[in-house]
A protein has these predicted regions:
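Glycoside hydrolase catalytic-domain context in secreted enzymes
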Residues: 1-135
């Protein structure tokens, strides 16, 4: 897809929402853009979403959309959904150990994820009671 079509037709509504509403999380899609799965698309997740639009939350996959966990981390995808229950953890560790994933990328991803948790705690209604707390 050419740049003009992408920006004028497909990205415009997302850009407005990100810049105006400042969501804490966003879910990427299953599909590919110009041959790259969106979970692994650094141009979209890092260059456009974070650098151009100022998104500072975390990005999670749509359910089952993860294809390559290490490439997704490099691209700026923080959270795999549903949980892989540790299945890709070994891939991440191996990639850090063999140098294909810089540990600072993993640190940054964790920081982005934790920042949302801290924002939630700072902004939550202290009088709200969750069902589990009632039981």
């Amino acid at each position: 897809m050419d740049e003009r079509t992408m920006r004028e037709i497909y990205l415009a509504s997302f850009e407005g929402m990100i810049k105006k509403e400042k969501p804490w999380t966003i879910m990427n899609a299953y599909n590919k853009l110009n041959g790259t799965y969106l979970c692994e698309n650094k141009e979209m997740l890092t260059d456009v979403l974070r650098r151009e639009w100022g998104f500072d939350g975390y990005v999670m996959t749509d359910w089952g959309a993860m294809n390559d966990r290490v490439e997704a981390l490099k691209a700026g995808c923080n959270l795999e959904m549903p949980s892989c229950e540790g299945a890709t953890d070994a891939e991440i560790v191996a990639a850090v150990q063999d140098g294909t994933l810089d540990e600072s990328v993993l640190d940054k991803s964790c920081e982005e994820y934790l920042n949302v948790i801290f924002k939630y705690e700072e902004n939550r209604d202290k009088n709200a009671v969750f069902q589990r707390e009632k039981d």
